[in-house]
């Protein structure tokens, strides 16, 4: 998995490429750890993500919980398969899906 993080003021943009699974989720957690306390919202660009497992969903949920008092988590560019997973798990009601 490739992870690119950019910050603009209080907005963190996380661009991912590959599969967000049990192997890559801890790497993403480590990459986000220092940033989440100082941003209001996080945008996940999933345009190049081909698959997400429960471990990946857990990272998205933990991110939402970390910023919910100040802002939100926005997901952009998710493919139909990932959108279906969000709908089946109720994540489409927790996250902002664009």
Q: Could you tell me what each predicted segment is?
A:
Residues 22-94:
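Amphipathic alpha-helical interaction surfaces in cytosolic regulatory modules
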Residues 96-98:
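Short acidic-hydrophobic, aromatic-tinged amphipathic segments that line or gate anion-handling sites
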């Amino acid at each position: 998995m490739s992870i690119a993080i950019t910050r603009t003021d209080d907005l963190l943009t996380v661009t991912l490429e590959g599969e967000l699974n049990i192997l890559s989720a801890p790497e993403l957690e480590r990459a986000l750890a220092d940033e989440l306390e100082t941003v209001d919202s996080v945008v996940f660009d999933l345009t190049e993500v081909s698959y997400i497992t429960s471990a990946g969903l857990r990272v998205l949920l933990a991110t939402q919980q970390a910023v919910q008092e100040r802002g939100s988590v926005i997901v952009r560019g998710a493919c139909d398969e990932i959108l279906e997973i969000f709908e089946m798990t109720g994540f489409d009601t927790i996250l902002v899906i664009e």
